[in-house]
Amino acid sequence: LSPGGRLRRISLEWHAPAPSGLRPAIAVNGSGDCRVTEGRRLIYGTDGRAEALEVLSADLADVVFREALNPPVPAGPPTAQGAVRVAVIDTGVNYTLPLFAGRLARDGAGGLLGYDFWDMDARPFDVDTARSPFFPLHHGTAVTSIVLREAPGAVILPYRYPRPDMTRFGDMVAHADRAGSVIVNMAMGSNAEADWRAFAQAAKARPHMLFIVSAGNDGRDLDKTPVYPAALGLDNILTVTSADADGRLARGSNWGASRVDVMVPGEQ
């Protein structure tokens, strides 16, 4: 609804029966006058997981665009010895993009180092369905591209964070440690300290690893109203906030005299 109460758009979802219960199948979006503007349909594989999202035309007859949700990892050569391995814990990475060819950490057989701790498989593809299965977000790919731009000599270990079970964070940190990563980028956070207990325990046990975490963008003082893991207070956590082009705190960025360590340009 608009501020004046006028209907601006409408969205309908249909969830279909599946062996594990109802699962999202199709969404139809319409304008304020109830005309269909597009449809979105999820395609499932034999394992019951969504493998593609199809965007449909207004009459729902044609597929306008098809987005893969869990494609195979392309083959690649083993990682060169001595390359700095940076773990990016986020929503995954779109490893099918040419941008990342040769920049993802791999073992001696060419297998991708990294893991999907959300779906618990070896395909950490960038899909965040937390808000809607029909409108997934792709935060991790953007973050990873920035890391590679700023650190051209690094290779990436992509991880998809364990939203269904945050206790898996302990296993994820251990996985990154075994894979040879001592730098971990985590542009994420939440208000619930309990969500981060497994991470805190694993990080504290590994002082040789540095975890670079975002302060967040809620426009608040973390010393008074904390966000985690930024406010965990571990010696091997570096909490970073954003500056604008003039070197001032960027609009909406969090701050904190004791909780935030560094402010860097982050608006461009």
Q: How would you name each of these model-derived features?
A:
Residues 94, 123, 149, 162, ...:
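Active-site/binding-pocket entry motifs
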Residues 5-87, 91, 97-99:
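Protease zymogen maturation seam
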Residues 90, 109, 227-268:
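Extracellular S/T/G-rich loop segment that most often corresponds to the catalytic His/Ser-adjacent loop
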Residues 70-154, 171, 175-182, 246:
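Active-site core segment of subtilase-fold serine proteases
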Residues 87-89, 115, 157-159, 212, ...:
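Hydrophobic/aromatic beta-strand patches that form the interior of the parallel beta-sheet core
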Residues 138, 142, 158-236, 246:
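Substrate-binding/access-modulating region of protease and related hydrolase catalytic domains
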Residues 78-81, 149-151, 177-178, 204-206, ...:
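Extracellular/periplasmic catalytic domains that process cell-envelope and extracellular macromolecules
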